[in-house]
Design a protein with these regions (language model features):
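Conserved short alpha-helical segments that host acidic/polar catalytic motifs at enzyme active sites
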Residues: 1-153
C-alpha cells in the first residue's frame, strides 16, 4: 500500500499497520494541528494493493480546539475516478475555514503529466506547498509518479 499525509501522522499510520492494527485506530490517536486559531486539519490517504483507497480528515470540532472530529472515507478502485480532500475552503481573516463535506470527485485523465499540471495549476498559489501524483497499473504493479514542490526548481 501507499500512505500519504500532510503531517507527521504518516509515522503513526505506518507503525499501527506494521503491528496489524487498523488505519482508523492509528488516526484516532491523532488530531488537527495545534495552531490556533486555524487548527489546521490533518489529511491522510491510504491506497491498498487492489487500488481501493481510504481518505481521512481530522479537524477541530469547535472554534476553541477542544475536541477533534474524525472523518473516514473508503472507495473502490474505479478507472478514471478519484476523490480529493484539501485543508481549507478559502482564505479567511482571522480564521481560515476548513474543508467541509465529503471528498470531491475528480476525473482522472489517462496522462499523468496532464493531471499533475491540472492539479498544480488549480491549487491556490499562496497556499500550495507540494503535490504527489501516482498512477499504478493494478495488473503489472508498475507505476509512474510525480512530486512537485513550490520550493524546488
Amino acid at each position: 500500500g501507499l500512505i500519504v499525509t500532510n503531517g507527521d501522522q504518516t509515522d503513526t499510520v505506518w507503525e499501527y499497520l506494521a503491528k496489524g492494527e487498523s488505519w482508523e485506530a492509528a488516526l484516532r490517536t491523532r488530531q488537527f494541528e495545534d495552531d490556533a486559531p486555524n487548527w489546521t486539519p490533518r489529511i491522510s490517504g491510504l491506497q491498498a494493493g487492489d487500488g481501493s483507497y481510504k481518505l481521512s480528515i481530522l479537524k477541530s470540532a469547535d472554534p476553541e480546539g477542544m475536541a477533534c472530529a474524525r472523518f473516514f472515507y473508503e472507495y473502490p478502485a474505479v478507472p478514471g475516478l478519484g476523490h480529493f480532500l484539501h485543508t481549507y475552503v478559502c482564505d479567511g481573516n482571522p480564521v481560515i475555514p476548513t474543508f467541509q463535506g465529503e471528498p470531491e470527485r475528480v476525473s482522472i485523465p489517462a496522462d499523468i503529466d496532464d493531471f499533475t499540471r491540472e492539479l498544480w495549476e488549480n491549487l491556490n498559489p499562496d497556499n500550495k506547498i507540494s503535490l504527489f501524483v501516482r498512477y499504478t497499473d493494478l495488473e503489472t504493479r508498475k507505476y509512474q509518479q510525480r512530486i512537485l514542490n513550490k520550493h524546488s526548481k
